[in-house]
Structure formats: structure tokens, C-alpha cells
Amino acid sequence: MQRTLLLAKIHNCTLTGANINYVGSISIDQILLDKSGILPYEQVQVVNNANGQRFITYAIPAPAHSGIIELNGAAARLGIIGDRVIIMTYGQFTSEELKSYTPTVVIVDEKNRPLEVRRYDDLLSQV
């Protein structure tokens, strides 16, 4: 049996743009992708704290150190500049893989600069 658990999260980002004319996706500062382990074109779930919207799209890299978090395409209608969002990916794990499971959470400031990277390597030790 496989279980679906959080793999990575970028917490409390600030939307810096919304481009309805782009093909789709969410642009994320390359530094945040690197620190979280989220890959370009990986499926992500985005939660908008301002309006409660939850949606799925895919990540594309924005220039490193740019602070860019930008909704593209149809997703651009689901948030406005200044909204705070959470970006998450999930993975499927077997019972054996769960023994080494470690989700990564990147906490950012209001300019989308990483403040802290948390790895919860003992999360399932009590399960």
C-alpha cells in the first residue's frame, strides 16, 4: 500500500504577479525551488490564504533571488498581488519508504526570501 504525504512546502509566500496571458503554471524564485526540493514542472497545490482558493498547477522557475511568486494563465484569476499563499507538493510512499521520509518546509519573509528550512526527519517516529 502507498500513502500520499506532504513532500515539500513553501510557507506564506507573497504573490508578486498574475499573468493571465501566460500558458499556465506558477513562477517560483529558483532559490525557493532549490531549498524546498520542488522541481521545475512538478505538480504543486497552491492555497491562497486571502480568499481560500485551492488549486493544482505546476511550478516553473523564476530568476534566482528575484522573490517572484507569480500566478500564470487561468490560475492568475485565483489571486492578486499581495495575497499570501502556501505552495505544496506531495509524494506517494510505501511503508518501507516512510522509514526515511522527511518533508521539507521553507519559511519565507514578506519579500519571499527564505528565512528557515525545516526538515521533519522524526515526524513518523511515533507512528
Swiss-Prot record:
Q: Which domain of life is it from?
A: Bacteria
> What SUPFAM superfamilies would the database entry show?
ADC-like
One GO CC annotation, please?
cytosol
The enzyme's first-digit EC class, named in words, is lyase
Pathway listed for it is: Cofactor biosynthesis; (R)-pantothenate biosynthesis; beta-alanine from L-aspartate: step 1/1
Single GO MF descriptor: aspartate 1-decarboxylase activity
Keywords on record? Autocatalytic cleavage, Cytoplasm, Decarboxylase, Lyase, Pantothenate biosynthesis, Pyruvate, Schiff base, Zymogen
Q: What is known about its processing and modification?
A: Is synthesized initially as an inactive proenzyme, which is activated by self-cleavage at a specific serine bond to produce a beta-subunit with a hydroxyl group at its C-terminus and an alpha-subunit with a pyruvoyl group at its N-terminus.
| Record: active site | 25 (schiff-base intermediate with substrate), 58 (proton donor)
GO terms for biological process, alphabetical: alanine biosynthetic process; pantothenate biosynthetic process
Sites binding substrate sit at 57, 73-75
Task: Detail the disulphide connectivity of this chain as listed in its UniProt entry.
Answer: none
EC assignment: the record states: 4.1.1.11
Q: How is the cofactor bound?
A: Binds 1 pyruvoyl group covalently per subunit.
According to the UniProt record, list the residues that bear Pyruvic acid (Ser): 25
Please give the coiled-coil regions recorded for this protein: none
Note the InterPro entries from the entry.
Answer: Asp_de-COase-like_dom_sf (IPR009010), Asp_decarbox (IPR003190)
Q: Where in the cell is it found?
A: Cytoplasm
Catalytic activity entry: L-aspartate + H(+) = beta-alanine + CO2
Recorded hits in HAMAP family, A to Z, give: PanD
Q: Record's NCBIfam families?
A: panD
Subunit structure as annotated in this protein's UniProt entry: Heterooctamer of four alpha and four beta subunits.
According to its UniProt entry, the function of this protein is described as: Catalyzes the pyruvoyl-dependent decarboxylation of aspartate to produce beta-alanine.
* Classification via PANTHER family: ASPARTATE 1-DECARBOXYLASE
Tell me its family. Answer: Belongs to the PanD family.
Record-given protein name: Aspartate 1-decarboxylase
